[in-house]
Amino acid sequence: MVLSGKPASILITGASSGIGEALACAYAAPDVRLFLSGRDPERLEQVASRCRESGSMVDAAVIDVTDREAMDRWISASDDVRPLDLVIANAGISGGSGSGTETTAIMRRIMDVNVGGVLNTIDLPLRRMAERGQGQIALVASLAGYRGLPSAPAYSASKAAVRALGGGLRPVYATRNVRVNVICPGFVVSRITDSNSFPMPMLMPADKAAKIIRSGLGRNQATIAFPWPMAFSSWLLGALPGWAAAPVLRRMPAKSPDCG
C-alpha cells in the first residue's frame, strides 16, 4: 500500500512508449511494484527492464485494453498480488486526418480504445479502492478534448469524453477517499508525434511531461493540463462560440493516423 504518502503499487496502461513509458520509469524505485501493459511486446519488455534496473519489481503484460474480460483478469490478479495504490489509464490511439476521411470503422476503433479502454481500466480498481477507502485513479485525456477538432473529430471527441468522465467521477469517489485526476497533455514526444509533419508548438519531452504529471498527482490536482500556454489557449478555444472558433479550427493541421 502507500508508503510515506507515495504509491507503492502502480498499474499503467500504454506503457510501451511515450507518456506511459516515461511515467513507468519515473515511478520505478525500490519497494515500488509496477504492473505495465502495452501493445508492443519488445518495447514493453525494454521498459520493464529499465524499471527493474531502478529497483522495481515489474509485471509486464501485452493486453488489448478493449478486451474487458482480459483486462478484468489482469487487473484483478495485479491487485491480488499487491493492492493497487495508483492506476493510470493511459493507453490510447490517435485519429486520422479528418475532413471526412475518417471512416466509421476508424472512428469506432478510436472510441473503443480511448473511451472503452479507459472504462475497462478503471472499473474494477475504482470498486476495490472504494471498498478499501483509499487509492488514486488517473485518466489521460488531452488538450484536444477541449473542443471538437475537424482535423481529428473522433480523437477529440474521445478525449472530451475521458475528460468529462474523470471530472464527474472525482466528487463521487472523493467521499470514499479515492482520488480521481484527469491529465490533459499537449504535444509530447512519442511515436505518434514522430510521424507528424506539421509544426507542433511547445513539443515536450516525455520525461518532462511525466515529471509534471507525477507532481500533479502527488498534489491531487483535479486537472493536470500542460503546457500552461497551450492549456489556456485550448480552454479559450473551447469557450468561444462556434462562429468565432471556426476560422481557428480551419487552420489547424491534420493529425497523423495511428489506429493500429
Give the location of each predicted region.
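Conserved glycine-rich cofactor-binding loop
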Residues: 14-17
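Conserved glycine-rich Rossmann-like NAD(P)H-binding loop of the short-chain dehydrogenase/reductase
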Residues: 32-47
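Substrate-binding pocket helix/loop in short-chain dehydrogenase/reductase
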Residues: 98-111
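Active-site loop immediately N-terminal to the catalytic Tyr-X3-Lys motif
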Residues: 100, 149-153
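Active-site helix of classical SDR
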Residues: 122, 158
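Residue(s) in the substrate-gating loop at a strand-loop-helix junction
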Residues: 142
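C-terminal helical subdomain
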Residues: 182, 198-234
